[in-house]
């Protein structure tokens, strides 16, 4: 976080947008939506080797407590309404990471009658993590890209 100005006696001045975005990037609470083998790599990212807790990322069991949804795996026609319902239950601001080839565009099962060809047809996606399955490092990089995106957004509406 860059300092815009320093005043005497240790006071720092900066825009409220930057303070809010700094707080949001340091406390992402993802709600996991594991549908296939990509979910195993998502669980690996939460283990002690990669330790998402050091980034302030704490997995939440309910959508009402989370601001990030990680969709990992093949999204079928039967699961699409459940995905949308969970997304609608999340409070604003909310972000979505699409993890893996199946979540991004259908993957190996792209031409199947039962598969949605990308979860972005159901919910708006902010970050796409490629791979089949993507590694835990790729998910970590995607989360860092999301943090950069959050830092660049304006949170306070200007008229």
UniProtKB/Swiss-Prot annotation:
Primary location class: membrane
A molecular-function term among this protein's GO annotations: NADH dehydrogenase (ubiquinone) activity
Biological-process GO terms, alphabetical: aerobic respiration; electron transport coupled proton transport
EC id: 7.1.1.-
Residues at which [4Fe-4S] cluster binds: 37-38, 102, 132
Cofactor(s) named in the record: [4Fe-4S] cluster
Quaternary data: NDH-1 is composed of 14 different subunits. Subunits NuoB, C, D, E, F, and G constitute the peripheral sector of the complex.
UniProt-listed NCBIfam families: nuoB_fam, PRK06411.1
Described purpose of this protein according to its UniProt entry: NDH-1 shuttles electrons from NADH, via FMN and iron-sulfur (Fe-S) centers, to quinones in the respiratory chain. Couples the redox reaction to proton translocation (for every two electrons transferred, four hydrogen ions are translocated across the cytoplasmic membrane), and thus conserves the redox energy in a proton gradient.
Annotated protein name in UniProt: NADH-quinone oxidoreductase subunit B
Name of the gene this protein is made from: nuoB
């Amino acid at each position: 976080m860059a300092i815009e100005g320093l005043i005497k006696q240790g006071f720092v001045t900066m825009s409220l947008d930057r303070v809010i975005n700094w707080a949001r990037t340091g406390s992402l609470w993802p709600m996991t939506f594991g549908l296939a083998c990509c979910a195993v790599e998502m669980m690996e990212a939460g283990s002690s080797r990669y330790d998402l807790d050091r980034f302030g990322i704490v997995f939440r069991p309910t959508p009402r407590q989370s601001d990030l949804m990680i969709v990992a795996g093949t999204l079928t026609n039967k699961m699409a309404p459940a995905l949308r319902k969970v997304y609608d239950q999340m409070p604003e601001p909310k972000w979505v990471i699409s993890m893996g080839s199946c979540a991004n565009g259908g993957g190996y099962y792209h031409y199947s009658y039962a598969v949605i060809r990308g979860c972005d047809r159901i919910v708006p996606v902010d970050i796409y993590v490629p791979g089949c399955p993507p590694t835990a490092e790729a998910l970590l990089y995607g989360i860092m890209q999301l943090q950069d995106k959050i830092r660049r957004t304006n949170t306070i509406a200007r008229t």
